[in-house]
Amino acid sequence: IACFDMEGTLTPEIWEQVALDTGIEGFNKTTRDIPDYGELMDFRLELMASNNLGISDIQNAVNKLDLLDGAKDFLDEIKESFQVVILSDTFHEFASPLMKKMGYPLLLCHNLDIDQDGSIKGYKLRHTKAKQQAIEAFQSIGYQCLAAGDSYNCLLYTSDAADELT
């Protein structure tokens, strides 16, 4: 199984596009700035609420994004030899347009809690170490895993995959 982080690896960063669209610099913060992902998401949701932004604003930003140069060709090539899984800290509620552009690989990510008017009230993390847990689960049922990502929070799961191959 070939496992990839999505944003920064195959696609641009969604929150950077939200920052560009809204002019709100705070949306550019990443886990480099706020290492705890829960704290980072709480910060982003507070920014959204204080600026009266909802899920449609994020979806509009995502609809403007395309895959990074070469990502589609890379995925098409690797699918000939591997099952592809996207292990991402993104959310199902706005990842769909990018999944379509990638040819609908399996996406393992989080969910948002959205009310009827489109306001984001919270989020549901699958697990605090979901990427690492997914790799370990695949390995526990006999799969060899390759993994790639672009950020500090990818180190645990990419090193777990590398350990298995050595």
Spans of model-derived segments:
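Alpha-helical substrate-recognition element adjacent to the catalytic core
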Residues: 1-111, 115-116
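Conserved small/polar residues in nucleotide/adenosyl-binding loops
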Residues: 157-162
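Short glycine-rich loop/turn motifs that provide flexible caps or phosphate-binding loops at active sites
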Residues: 7, 121, 148
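N-terminal low-complexity segments that are often proline-rich with Ser/Thr-Pro
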Residues: 165-166
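A short glycine-/small-residue-rich loop at the edge of a beta-strand within enzyme catalytic domains
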Residues: 62, 122, 126
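Short, charged, surface-exposed secondary-structure boundary motifs
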Residues: 115-123
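Conserved Lys-Pro-Asp/Glu-containing loop-to-beta segment of HAD-superfamily phosphomonoesterases
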Residues: 130-156
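Short, well-ordered alpha-helical scaffold segments within catalytic/effector domains
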Residues: 68-72, 128-135
